[in-house]
Every structure is written in C-alpha cells, then in structure tokens.
Amino acid sequence: TALELSTKIRANRETIGAIDFDKPESKVVVDENGEVLDIVLRERGISERLIEDFMLSANEVIGEHFYWMQVPFIYRIHEEPKMEKLRQFFDIAASLGYRTKGKIEEIEPYMLANMLRKFKGEVVETMLSTILLRTMNQARYSINNIGHFALATKYYTHFTSPIRRYPYLLVHRMIRTYLFNGDVSDQTIDNFITRLPDLAESSSEYEKRAVDCEREVDRMKKCEYMLKYQEQTFRGIVSSVTNFGVFITLERSNIEGLVHIKAMNDDYYTYDQKNMLLIGRRKKKVYRLGDEVIVKVANVDLENQEIDFKILKHKSLISKK
C-alpha cells in the first residue's frame, strides 16, 4: 500500500541520517472578517506525512537524473551548518545531559539526527530543535549541485508544486525541454547557462521575502489574539534564554513572548552564554531551557509585534530529575 511504501521511504531516510525538524506550528483560526478566533497547535496527519515522503523521493530522483545528464539545471542545495552556532548548540545540549559522539568539525547529518532522537519526547525537544535549526544555513536554489545537508542526499531539486512556486515550474520546463522534446542542442544549453544563475538567485531571494512576510503576519495575528488576554495567566516553557531576558512559549498555542530582564526584579541576573542560562547573583536561581513557568500577559505591542510576560511561578527543569 501507499502507507507501507511511505513507511519504508521514511525508514530509509532515517537510516542515511536525514534530519527531521518536526517542530510544532501554530494554526491561526479566523472568522470571515479575518478576526482571530483562536490559535491552536497544528497537527500533521498520516496523509500529510505520506505525501511529504513521496515528494522528497520524487525530488531526489529528478535531481539525480539531470545531474547525470550533465545539462544546466536548478538544484535545491543546503550547505553544512554554521560551525560557531553548532558548537553553542552542543554546549547547551550537553548542559542538559545530551551529548554526541564525533568531532564537530567533521559533522555529518546522521550525528545531528541521532541527537534529535535522544531528546525526542522530552520537554526540551522543541527548544533544542529550534536552536539546532538556527545553526543551519538556509536552503537555496543553485545551478551548482553540492547536495542537501539536512536531507543527507547528494541530489535534490524542487518540482512537485509547479502551480504555486516559480522554481518548480522552471524545473518542469527543463524536464519538458530535455526529456519530452529531446532538445539538448547547443542553443538550448547556452540559453539555460545564461539565464539559470539569475533565476536561481532571484528565486531564493523571493522565497526569503515570502517566509519573512509569513512570519510577520503570524506575529501580528498572535499579538491581536493576545490583546484579549492581558493580565490573564498561562502555562509556558522557557524556550530561549538571552542576555536581555527569557522567551516563554505558551503550551497550548505555541505563542512566544519575552520576560525582559528588567522585569525580573527578584535578583540581579547574569548571562551564561555558553550554556544559555540566566543566573541570579544573590539567590542563585537559574533559568534554563525547558523550565516550566506560569506567566501573566503584561503588555502587547501591536506596532512592534511584541508580547511581554511577567513570571508568576517558576519550576526548574533540573529539579524534576
């Protein structure tokens, strides 16, 4: 069956070390006027995963086929992670009890995939996955095939959704030209060699703009929603720690807000960048990833798309071990 085939494809991807960032996403529920009714966690069903498995496999097959045809083509490439940020990720993970084998300088996808499996299902899973994701370079389009690091594959392209993304449509045109029409003439090759670099670069740039726009709308709708809940309390998890405060992600909705260090007036806190900790100088209270908190919505700034929380209760992740 299709499900059995999908399961085998996914198992094979895990075997070769593909990295699966299965992060929870928010779903914004709006009425006919665009007013936010609710924000809930989006659930990925079996059918969605099945389609994703087949799409990934199809993209690999097309990418490899045209690589060996040695014709101008557009690939979806993904370079190795940024080493400095990767070291910080491993330091933070180690401080929480998760260590990996092997040299960071010789990083391979399977090492990161194994690390993700170590804390799968744990309270810190989403936070550590997010930090790891931020170490990654953004995938982009290029005529030079260097493989796709996160997918642990040597060949990859995008062609499965030509009705909604230009690079996919462009790949379809090349498939039609090279395969269906059998046109690999010098004129055609020269035309693609001339045009593809700019098309790949502009496609990558416009994709980045679209992602930024989507994130901005997401933040805007979350702020609109939280305006209704000022001064109300929520359960959350410490999702990031910085030198200017701690970010809290609410459990039910995945909405994130900041507790600024100026609002943490029970002590004077110093920042441990290596382990991503805020440590109280007098009381030695420590804020770290995964800590459970109860927060109050202190302020919502629609113009700057910022949500401020105030911590009412704090339970350390370490205290539960």
Located regions from the model:
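Electropositive polyanion-binding surfaces
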Residues: 1-265, 290, 296-321
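Beta-strand/loop nucleic-acid-binding surfaces
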Residues: 254-286
